Regions:
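A surface-exposed beta-strand-loop module
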Residues: 141-166
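Surface-exposed ligand/attachment interfaces on beta-rich extracellular proteins
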Residues: 3, 33-38, 94-97
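Long, contiguous binding/interaction regions
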Residues: 27-30, 167
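Polar/acidic, low-complexity leader/linker segments enriched in S/T/G and N/D
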Residues: 1-27
């Protein structure tokens, strides 16, 4: 984990309902003089970008959106965003189970939550699990006690530490760590209502 500043709060739900997004990969493409391409994958993690447009009362825009923007100092601090159709390790929106995803072993007894897309697809590191939703299994048996979840890093600690040969799986609901990727323009529509311009958010792979 990095030392970048992060606000442990979520973008308001009304904003999430109006968001569109896409996932992109860091691929460096170089073309030779003969027109041949050479492609290099910089890292294997998808980076999600959200585009949000918000029309509400002026009070809601100021109290919810602009207040978060100023608390974050624009692009400086990250915060949580829940994608409306991708917030669970069980499919996209299912109730998480202890058998959803393999956990990556970091050290003795410490594991990282992940979500793998497809049977051989890319993996998204889950840094921001939702509190109280993580369940874990060891060798196909649910671990009922001795599990501690750090909801700011997505790291799971199991005590006593499992053997290195044990298969550890888990599941949870999760938020995506993001930051603002531009300024916020506000246009008054009436004495009581206003709308924002396009609000760009970008996922953080080192929150």
């Amino acid at each position: 984990m990095s030392n970048n500043p992060f606000l442990e709060e979520r973008l308001p739900i009304a904003v999430r309902l109006g968001a569109s997004y896409n996932d992109e990969y860091a691929v460096e493409v170089t073309k030779t003089a003969s027109g041949q391409e050479h492609r290099k994958l910089i890292h294997p993690f998808p980076v999600r970008r959200f585009s949000v447009h918000y029309t509400k009362s002026k009070g809601e825009i100021y109290d919810q959106i602009l207040a978060l923007y100023h608390r974050a100092y624009g692009k400086f601090k990250g915060f949580r965003v829940q994608a409306m159709d991708d917030y669970s390790t069980n499919g996209a929106t299912g109730t998480p189970t202890a058998f959803d995803q393999p956990l990556s072993r970091l050290s003795a007894g410490v594991y990282q939550l992940y979500k793998v897309y497809g049977s051989t697809g890319a993996a998204r590191t889950i840094f921001k699990p939702v509190a109280g939703t993580t369940v874990v299994a060891k060798n196909g048996v649910i671990v009922e006690s001795g599990v501690t979840v750090n909801t700011t890093t997505g790291q799971v600690t199991i005590s006593p530490p499992p053997l290195i040969t044990n298969v550890i799986t888990g599941g949870c609901l999760f938020d995506i760590p993001c930051r603002f990727d531009g300024e916020i323009d506000v246009t008054p529509l009436s004495p009581n209502y206003a709308e924002t311009g396009e609000i760009m958010l970008v996922e953080l792979i080192n929150p």
